[in-house]
Amino acid sequence: MLISLPKVRGIYRYDVLMSKATWLNVGGRADVLFKPCDIEDLTYLIKNTELPVSVIGATSNIIVRDSGIRGITVKLGKEFAYIKSKGNNSIVAGGAVLLSNLAHFAGNQQISGLEFLVGIPGTVGGGIEMNAGAYGSDIASVVQSIKAVNLEDGNLYEFSSEEMGYFYRGHSLKGNWIFVEAEFKGVNSEYELILQRLKEVIERKNKSQPIRGKTAGCIFKNPKNYRAWELIDKSGCLRLNIGGARISKKHCNFLLNYDNATASDLENLGNKVKDAVKDKFNVELEWEIRVLGSY
């Protein structure tokens, strides 16, 4: 690849096929995949490149388009997968920590309030970005402070939960960010009670979601005063399919790659569902899955 990249301490990989790296098993090639070895390495890269910088986490809620991703794609690795207890029912976690691991760590520390995270695929960084939530709880309710690197100026910032301006499945920060660390706070509880709640969340998820299929979580956010899956179902979308992509019969707010679908199949099917709901209810569904790459 004939491009000039800053000299870093982390790892560059070139021409990476994203269909091998995403939960949906779709997507073209990323020009450059970069795993920084620490925050300083990450900030140095951003400050010393003119290439566009994108961010991926566990890739559990993204569609990478068939054309791939231009520029540099950052993925936090094991160096950002640390979890430690701070005392006073507080936990510090790096941006690459899986949310399920955070939930189990909290349980082992007898810290309650984070059990809902056990059923959410993805990382701390991704969960902070989208204010991930389930069963009436969300990241905003348990996060205390956040460290983030701005993708435009490359500087490190720290925000309180209030400064994030959280709302349903989003936040109010301007610009593009990569969330590298967060502090969470729960309440003390008995281990057996926490363990029971963890089991209940997992069982509920297993009963209602297509966990064994190639999916990327919920397609759409719930519109105000509606549930997305109900609108999709009542719009007659349950049997829709395009190419190798179809709507899950177990939970119709999930896309499935069931037969070698392309990214275009999945994105077009999602847009077809959007159009059907708009025509039936005059409600505009908003993607919860992130779509990366250009046409």
Swiss-Prot record:
Residues 26-189 form the FAD-binding PCMH-type domain. Its main location: cytoplasm. Disulfide bonds: none annotated. One of its GO terms (molecular function) is UDP-N-acetylmuramate dehydrogenase activity. Pathway: Cell wall biogenesis; peptidoglycan biosynthesis. Keywords: Cell cycle, Cell division, Cell shape, Cell wall biogenesis/degradation, Cytoplasm, FAD, Flavoprotein, NADP, Oxidoreductase, Peptidoglycan synthesis. Its cofactor is FAD. InterPro entries: FAD-bd_PCMH, FAD-bd_PCMH-like_sf, FAD-bd_PCMH_sub1, FAD-bd_PCMH_sub2, MurB, MurB_C, MurB_C_sf, Oxid_FAD_bind_N. GO terms for biological process: cell division; cell wall organization; peptidoglycan biosynthetic process; regulation of cell shape. GO terms for cellular component: cytosol. Pfam families: FAD_binding_4, MurB_C. It catalyses: UDP-N-acetyl-alpha-D-muramate + NADP(+) = UDP-N-acetyl-3-O-(1-carboxyvinyl)-alpha-D-glucosamine + NADPH + H(+). The active site is at R169, C218 (proton donor), E288. It is found in: Cytoplasm. It is an enzyme of class 1 (oxidoreductase). Its EC number is 1.3.1.98. Transmembrane segments: none annotated. Belongs to the MurB family. Cell wall formation. PANTHER family: UDP-N-ACETYLENOLPYRUVOYLGLUCOSAMINE REDUCTASE. HAMAP family: MurB. NCBIfam families: murB (TIGR00179), PRK13905.1 (NF010480). This is UDP-N-acetylenolpyruvoylglucosamine reductase. It comes from Wolbachia pipientis wMel. The lineage of its organism: Bacteria, Pseudomonadati, Pseudomonadota, Alphaproteobacteria, Rickettsiales. The gene is murB.
